[in-house]
């Protein structure tokens, strides 16, 4: 606690790690053909996607560096700074997107690549703005982030990587399970895919609520642990789990009750609307399980536990979610009830996989908190 200068060194080393990882990411994004081939899209669509990803790759270093600064602001209880930066970026990106996509003022219409260029510009603008705030802000001077130049320290980089890699892979597993779900549903036809995309988009928006609460919880748990208050850390974690779950149960009920007005916001054709509405029951349950698992995962990160959760995600989301969804959606065994075939089968399996992940992660949290409290009794003064 209060080892402020060490925070600056951690940030500098994290920037080195983000640079190395962004180079790997750029290499993958610049050669996406093997991944896109899974979708079996038309050559025209694939060509546009390849160009889009190759442009987006140039924004990755800025995005990765920005993630380090986001983590710093969250850790020192200054998330509002990042929030305002992101809101400002959003207001800039909307007209920039429109300009580059549709053209004007001497710029030809670029379409989807224009959107990618706008994203790259905003990513770099965010990074520069956040870096400037840390450099000039009086609050941040105590951390000495820019006090000196640090060469890569292999020991510190490895320490960061050991914790960060499982967290990153957990994100990868979660994102790819959802992405491949869409790719598989695409094989069912444009109608099921359109319905799925509407529900998935709504689910992504709703996910921001438990995600933001989970990030705040992780910060408070980490701060309590750093202050040698393990009992407080456990109490904060439990309170957050209860509050987040109750909130998402309420959200799930609202989504189910107001499914038709919510669908009307997307103004879909009637056939797409019918396809999407059949998935709303799943998203109502999905929100609750998603809230439980993400909150538990972030609490465990506060305890510096990330390796076991990564495997829980892999087995649950890839094995149960994708594997189970494939079996149900495509009626692999030949005796799957029609009511849970197609896109509904994928959503059912995905919801079940999140429920399993949530149960396992909560169990791990209870054991971890109990063990940590036993090994680190509260400091008495």
Residue ranges and their predicted role:
Residues 1, 7, 35, 49, ...:
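Hydrophobic/aromatic residues within transmembrane alpha-helices of membrane transport systems
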Residues 1-26, 30, 63-82, 195-259, ...:
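Small-residue-rich hydrophobic transmembrane alpha-helices
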Residues 13, 22, 26, 89-91, ...:
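Residue-level recognition of pore/gate-forming positions within transmembrane alpha-helices
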Residues 18-108, 113-121, 128, 132, ...:
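Hydrophobic transmembrane helix module of multi-pass membrane transport proteins
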Residues 24-54, 250-273, 277, 330-333:
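Short membrane-interface helical motifs at transmembrane helix boundaries
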Residues 56-63, 158-223, 227, 244-252, ...:
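Transmembrane helix-bundle signature of multi-pass secondary active exporters and lipid flippases
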Residues 80, 91-128, 274, 307, ...:
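Membrane-interface helix-loop junctions in multi-pass transport and translocation proteins
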Residues 112, 116-119, 131-174, 370-381:
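Interhelical loop/hinge segments that connect adjacent transmembrane helices in multipass membrane
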């Amino acid at each position: 606690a209060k080892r402020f200068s060490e925070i600056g060194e951690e940030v500098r080393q994290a920037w080195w790690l983000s640079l190395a990882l962004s180079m790997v990411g750029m290499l993958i994004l610049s050669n996406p053909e093997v991944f896109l081939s899974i979708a079996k899209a038309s050559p025209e669509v694939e060509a546009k996607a390849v160009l889009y990803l190759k442009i987006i790759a140039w924004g990755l270093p800025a995005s990765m560096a920005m993630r380090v600064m986001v983590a710093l602001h969250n850790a020192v209880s200054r998330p509002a700074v990042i929030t305002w930066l992101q809101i400002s970026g959003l207001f800039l990106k909307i007209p920039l997107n429109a300009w580059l996509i549709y053209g004007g003022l001497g710029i030809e219409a670029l379409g989807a690549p224009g959107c990618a260029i706008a994203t790259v510009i905003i990513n770099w603008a965010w990074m520069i703005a956040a870096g400037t705030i840390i450099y000039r802000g009086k609050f941040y001077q105590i951390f000495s982030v820019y006090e000196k130049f640090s060469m890569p320290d292999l020991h510190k980089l490895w320490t960061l990587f050991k914790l960060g890699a499982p967290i990153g892979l957990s994100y990868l597993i979660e994102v790819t399970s959802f992405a491949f779900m869409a790719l598989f549903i695409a094989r069912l036809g444009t109608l099921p895919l359109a319905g799925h995309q509407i529900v998935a988009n709504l689910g992504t928006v709703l996910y921001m609520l438990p995600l933001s609460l989970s990030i705040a919880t992780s910060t408070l748990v980490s701060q309590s642990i750093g202050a040698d208050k393990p009992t407080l850390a456990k109490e904060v974690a439990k309170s957050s789990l209860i509050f987040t779950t109750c909130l998402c149960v309420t959200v799930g009920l609202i989504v189910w009750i107001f499914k038709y007005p919510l669908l009307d916001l997307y103004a879909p054709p009637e056939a797409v609307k019918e396809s999407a509405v059949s998935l709303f029951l799943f998203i109502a349950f999905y929100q609750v399980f998603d809230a439980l698992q993400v909150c538990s995962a972030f609490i465990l990160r506060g305890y510096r536990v990330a390796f076991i959760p990564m495997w829980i995600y892999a087995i649950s989301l890839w094995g149960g979610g994708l594997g189970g969804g494939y079996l149900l959606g495509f009626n692999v065994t030949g005796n799957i009830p029609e009511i849970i075939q197609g896109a509904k089968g994928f959503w059912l399996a995905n919801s079940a996989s999140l429920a399993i992940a949530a149960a396992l992660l909560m169990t791990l949290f209870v054991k971890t908190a109990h063990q940590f409290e036993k090994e680190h009794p509260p400091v008495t003064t």
